[in-house]
Amino acid sequence: MQNKIDYKNIKKIGLVTRPNVSLDKEILKLQSILSIYKVELVLLKESSEILDLPKYGLDDLFKISDFVISLGGDGTLISLCRKACEYDKAVLGIHAGHLGFLTDFKVDEAENFFQAFFQGEFRIEKPYLLSIFLEDRQGKILEKLAFNDVVISKNNQASMAHIEVFRKEKKFNEYFGDGLIVATPAGSTAYNLSANGPIVYTLAQAFILTPVCSHSLTQRPIVLPKGFEIEIMAKDCMLCIDGQENYKMNDFKSIKVGLSDKNVALIHPKNRDYFQILKEKLHWGN
């Protein structure tokens, strides 16, 4: 994944916006700022129906852009991060949605950010994603990535989820309850946190198993290292990747999950402080 950005030779920056929301005013402001630095702003086709700016499909946008801006909330950024891994391109999150942990600033603050950026004053963090291998009944394997989490949950008909977890074909845990979350460190402050899972530093090489409303008081979250792959078996359950892609567990004979070798380069202001963000968002010390 992209380790550094040649900020002195940026020619094109792609932009993907939060879907189904008009952000034309914000797009024009970003275009105006970037034009000062002789940088062309190019859009995903669906980002605006009105603006007369170059527009591309998502794959072409990544191919021609030096990096890509996500203008929206955490959900917009998460879906973009999975795609960024395919093209080895960095992503910058600008907030225009529900306030989250991943987007650092609003469009009104973009002028100050880019002034610093084009002087080399920025940082890149590279959180790891999850790899999910879904093997269907015919032996075909589908590989997916998750930025935040994979959630196994009961379907509407089941009274509870029965989930078995194996390591090297040996069962090491069995869960009865509403479901199971497999979360990345970056995703530890999302659904995992709501289910009383631990907060894990974003750049840690680990992942988390957190039961959801377990029927046993002894079932607790567990943090596992990179290189530790688990196999999950559960009948009549659904598997959801990053809250965006859904699969029926019954369609697969094997589902394996572990921390991926792939990470995504996220561009941040140089003064970004992870623990200050936790303090502000979670109201620590108030």
From Swiss-Prot:
Listed cofactors: a divalent metal cation
Any single GO BP term: NAD metabolic process
Residues where NAD(+) binds: 74-75, 148-149, 178, 186, 189-194, 244
EC number: 2.7.1.23
Gene Ontology molecular function: any one: metal ion binding
Superkingdom of this protein's organism: Bacteria
Localization: Cytoplasm
Cellular component aspect of the GO annotation: cytoplasm
Calcium listed as a keyword: no
Catalytic activity: NAD(+) + ATP = ADP + NADP(+) + H(+)
Spans through the membrane: none
Family affiliation: Belongs to the NAD kinase family.
HAMAP family: NAD_kinase
Protein name: NAD kinase
